[in-house]
Amino acid sequence: MDYLPIFADLKQRPVLVVGGGEVAARKVDLLLRAGAEIRIVAQSLSPILEQLSQQGQIHWLGQAFAAEQLDEVFLVIAATDDSALNAEVFSEADKRRVLANVVDDQPRCSFIFPSIIDRSPLVVAVSSSGQAPVLARMLREKLEALLPASLGQMAEVAGRWRGQVKQRLNAIGERRRFWEKTFGGRFATLVANGQTAEAQRQLEQDLEQFAQGSEGTQGEIALVGAGPGDVGLLTLRGLQVMQQADVVLYDHLVSDEILDLVRRDAERICVGKRAGAHSVIQEETNRLLVELAQQGKRVVRLKGGDPFIFGRGGEELQVAAAAGIPFQVVPGVTAAAGATAYAGIPLTHRDHAQSVTFITGHCRPDGDGLDWADLARARQTLAIYMGTMKAADISQRLIAHGRAATTPVAVISRGTRADQLVQTGTLQQLEQLAQQAPLPALLVIGEVVELHHQIAWFGHQPQAEGVSRPAVVNLA
């Protein structure tokens, strides 16, 4: 270990900063957040530092560094572009046993700054001992994605309850088990969702049960949108919830790459729906959700796209609510937004479409109830989910209600994935395009489809209108 990682209390402690530029300003910002009393020496101050000086947040000692300025300071930072001055600062600090940091000059550092993930009061520091700062920064960025912003508030609440928990639970091991269950249970979810008062009540209830010898954990359901396929489109919140799951119920549309991000010891159950017997399968999914949550498990219902857009997520949460099970929803990038963006087809455009309508081709048995005359209006975009089997009926109805047979259309298969296929043509060719489209596929109808030939950017791109490569088929 080249450096001992410690956390220093700088509140109201004098710290000297030599330098007045942007680098010095960044260090000053960090020191202010730690509550330090900042003294600064510089020929001139950057606008930010000058403002801080005028506000009395820092004390500008003068333009020239003098060794006696180090007397009684806790540490010093040299952040100038004068290497000789930086060396002098370090030398004088070393003589006085004052901790010193010369920016970007590791040999002249008795301490170094780590990369910081700030979830105050929870703080994570990452360091490569100055050997690979870019690597440390990259690791910090990965940790930033994994650590919810609510951790700080969670730690604050826990800090306020430490005394009461210690009074109620005498044994150290007992307290440890309590906090492990608390931080991994309903309390954490409530804090993350901004329900602080409810979180306090939950913690009080959990403590009472624990003190009475009942360590039962309340189960919950998280409805999570996995996005259209590309793992990079999964939200940070979705990733965090998935990595806390005990059980994951997922659909066929969820990619293997996204499933690989689920907590490794979580149980995975595929509840994907195929054509036929949908009500029975959905009822079984509803039963599993309730049953598993009632066992005290954190259940993630992982759905492709967004769970509230043609995903029957609302129906599943109605069942959870009726059973009295807590739940939360994590939205996802819906297929119509993701697939069209990756195909270079804007859903709206000032010159072509002032509105967009999402439709499902998989309707209830008693009919679709759609206003086809309204859907046939020009200058709008239709995005149709699960519509390949009804493509012929869709095109016939739209044409019959006045939409031009030459209206541009696209069928996007496996949108946002590496093997994405985009087929384009006209409304009268929609059935032919849909018949040869791999599933899952999205139908897009409207003049905006023409822009695909100009701004397609992902995967194989069309060379010109009427000319195609393997991943782009044009029947127009």
Curated annotation (Swiss-Prot):
Annotated stretches, region: Precorrin-2 dehydrogenase /sirohydrochlorin ferrochelatase: 1-203
Lineage of producing organism: Bacteria, Pseudomonadati, Pseudomonadota, Gammaproteobacteria, Enterobacterales
GO MF term list: NAD binding; precorrin-2 dehydrogenase activity; sirohydrochlorin ferrochelatase activity; uroporphyrin-III C-methyltransferase activity
Catalytic activity: uroporphyrinogen III + 2 S-adenosyl-L-methionine = precorrin-2 + 2 S-adenosyl-L-homocysteine + H(+); precorrin-2 + NAD(+) = sirohydrochlorin + NADH + 2 H(+); siroheme + 2 H(+) = sirohydrochlorin + Fe(2+)
SUPFAM superfamilies to which the protein is assigned, alphabetical: NAD(P)-binding Rossmann-fold domains, Siroheme synthase middle domains-like, Tetrapyrrole methylase
Active site: 251, 273
Pathway the protein contributes to: Cofactor biosynthesis; adenosylcobalamin biosynthesis; precorrin-2 from uroporphyrinogen III: step 1/1; Cofactor biosynthesis; adenosylcobalamin biosynthesis; sirohydrochlorin from precorrin-2: step 1/1; Porphyrin-containing compound metabolism; siroheme biosynthesis; precorrin-2 from uroporphyrinogen III: step 1/1; Porphyrin-containing compound metabolism; siroheme biosynthesis; siroheme from sirohydrochlorin: step 1/1
Protein name per Swiss-Prot or TrEMBL: Siroheme synthase 1
Start and end residues of each stretch annotated as Uroporphyrinogen-III C-methyltransferase: 219-476
Name of the gene: cysG1
Binding-site list for NAD(+): 22-23, 43-44
Binding annotation for S-adenosyl-L-methionine: 228, 304-306, 309, 334-335, 386, 415
NCBIfam families: cobA_cysG_Cterm, cysG_Nterm, PRK06136.1, PRK10637.1
InterPro entries recorded: 4pyrrol_Mease, 4pyrrol_Methylase_sf, 4pyrrole_Mease_sub1, 4pyrrole_Mease_sub2, CobA/CysG_C, NAD(P)-bd_dom_sf, Siro_Cobalamin_biosynth, Sirohaem_synt_dimer_dom_sf
Similarity remark: In the N-terminal section; belongs to the precorrin-2 dehydrogenase / sirohydrochlorin ferrochelatase family. In the C-terminal section; belongs to the precorrin methyltransferase family.
Role this protein plays: Then it catalyzes the NAD-dependent ring dehydrogenation of precorrin-2 to yield sirohydrochlorin. Finally, it catalyzes the ferrochelation of sirohydrochlorin to yield siroheme.
Keywords: Cobalamin biosynthesis, Lyase, Methyltransferase, Multifunctional enzyme, NAD, Oxidoreductase, Phosphoprotein, Porphyrin biosynthesis, S-adenosyl-L-methionine, Transferase
E.C. number(s) listed in UniProt: 2.1.1.107, 1.3.1.76, 4.99.1.4
